UniProtKB/Swiss-Prot annotation:
SMART domains: YqgFc (SM00732)
Single Gene Ontology MF annotation: nuclease activity
Originating organism: Helicobacter pylori (strain Shi470)
Keywords: Cytoplasm, Hydrolase, Nuclease, Ribosome biogenesis
One biological process term in Gene Ontology: rRNA 5'-end processing
Function: Could be a nuclease involved in processing of the 5'-end of pre-16S rRNA.
Subcellular localization, as worded in the UniProt entry: Cytoplasm
UniProt-recorded name of the protein: Putative pre-16S rRNA nuclease
Family: Belongs to the YqgF nuclease family.
Taxon lineage: Bacteria, Pseudomonadati, Campylobacterota, Epsilonproteobacteria, Campylobacterales
Entry EC no(s): 3.1.-.-
Classification via CDD domains: YqgF
Length: 134
């Protein structure tokens, strides 16, 4: 199974590829990086993940890239790790919330649904860029 994550300072959005369908999962709320890495490790084991797709912004965001790489190194994951450009994934996910009212959009941001929708976009890019070439 393949899992994608959108690593942020407060939340980690999660999506999985299940039988060819991309599904958002409940986001991991970060209290600190050790707790968040434990929670992600548990999920990777529980779902028997073989490939972890991680969204990273372009090189001009050096601090963010370093933070994401450091976080991923905290994981005890033996499968394949693939980094995919995540530029605009959060913006695209937010645009997909157009059907929600203002209050529900704010709630979707706060509870991590937006982050998991962003992870769906990252996983979709992985499928388009990597899986179609296999």
């Amino acid at each position: 199974m393949i899992l994608a994550c959108d690593v942020g300072l407060k939340r980690i959005g999660i999506a999985v590829l299940l039988n060819g369908v991309i599904l958002p999962l409940e986001a991991i709320l970060r209290h600190n990086r050790n707790q968040a890495s434990r929670d992600l490790n548990d999920l990777l084991r529980e779902k028997n993940i073989q490939v972890l797709v991680v969204g990273k912004p372009n090189e001009s965001y050096a601090d963010t890239n370093a933070r994401i790489e450091h976080f991923i190194k905290l994981l005890d994951f033996k499968g394949e790790i693939v980094f995919i450009n995540e530029d605009r994934s959060s913006i695209e996910a937010y645009e997909n919330l157009g059907h929600l009212g203002k209050k529900n959009k704010r709630l979707a941001i706060k509870d991590g649904r937006l982050d998991s929708l962003s992870a769906c976009g990252i996983l979709e890019r992985y499928c388009q860029q990597v899986l179609k070439n296999r």
